[in-house]
Amino acid sequence: MKQLHDLRALPLVSIAAMMAAVPALAQTNTSSLDHEVVLSDLDAPWDMAFLPDGTMFFTEKCHGLSVRLPDGTVNALLGVGDTAGYATNGEDLFCEGQAGMMGVAVDPDFADNRRIYVYSTSNMSDPHTNRLMRFEVNGDLTDVSGRTDLVDDVPYKMEATDQPFGGPGAHNGGRVAFGPEGHLFLTTGDNHNAEVPQSPTMMGSKVLRLDTDGNAAEGNAPPEGFDPRTYTYGHRNVQGLAFHPGTGTPITAEHGPWHSDEITVLENGGNGGWDPRPNMAGRGDCPDGYCGYEPNQMEGMNRYERRAYMPMTDFETYPDAMPPIWTNNGWSQGISGAAFLEGEAWGDWEGAMVVSYLGIGFGGTPVGERIDVVELDEGEISVFDVTEMTLPMESQRFRALATGPDGSLYVSSEEGMIHKLTPTD
């Protein structure tokens, strides 16, 4: 599948910044794939994290945190609200709209400290917030204890607004991951609040880089006046985060506002360039003060016109914004998960990035439920090639990707399944 970029209707500065994002002609699969359904009948599985022996922690948005042991046994650890069947329940945790239990990460020193980290929505405060919590897992992996709320001030959307997908609980980000240097990363979203992305103090629309106690990681370099936990800001709703295997550089996958899904190489202190405020960049007022969906609420705009009217990365206003290395040919198809393929069995794709899509099938947008393999140039992090993976199962709304310790690619779907894809000769 060839991915090109129609650069009409873009400012010249945008064209210059995006020229590097045009990949070459895609190749075919380098290997065939074996397919196994690891789990099914789940409630919107959101994320996965592994121990070296193949033990898999996973979250379900409205149910909670569970663990699958290597023998296939599943233990339900932490329930959302009063969800039955869990060893422990977080009574303040709830799900609504896009919100609920989202990301999970395993501490690099888990063998010694038994710690895991979970990002979930909480009604402990009013207004409600999204929280990054730390727990200890007991020795036989049947329960968690010792809850510590490391980050308790990520905003949550309390009320419905006049936008598509405008209900409560929108745009929370949600990915939690450890970088190769041991820092803990958390991605957050804009809640359909136009003031959040460029705010120095509101913790939505950010990528936070933390130590394991929730403090700002040493070396963070946000602009003056910003919360020191900020690694990057000006994001819309990052849900994909992975680290380049050669450099350790964090790379995000972020779905756009009915145009321009993006893959972006993060820069410490960088601005993602998302600013949906009214009366900016030539725009006037917008419904409920949020312009992020306004072009979608106006008839007759194609994806290029929408991109020019409400840019995902606004280079005119923020000429030093981090440029995306790929923009999905101007479409927004719900890019979500991100990972890197590991192991020689992947052939030419070893070390390539993979991204998943939830799919959006209205307003002229192709549905796009798929997994793409994004090959990066050696020596610099730019896109060389993008190939749609030929899947041995039917496409679904693919939420998350994770590389297991066995080198297989694990894929969660909104249809309640976790798939395992293993390359074969």
Where are the regions a protein language model picked out?
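Sec/Tat signal peptide C-region and signal peptidase I cleavage site
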Residues: 22-26
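Bacterial N-terminal signal peptides that target proteins for export
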Residues: 2-12
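Conserved blade-ending motifs and adjacent loop-strand segments that build the rim/top face
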Residues: 381-405
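Acidic, Gly/Ser/Thr-rich repeat motifs that build Ca2+-stabilized beta-propeller blades
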Residues: 27-195, 248-252, 256, 331-379, ...
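Bacterial N-terminal signal peptides
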Residues: 11-21
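Beta-propeller domain segments
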Residues: 85-95, 99-101, 109-111, 131, ...
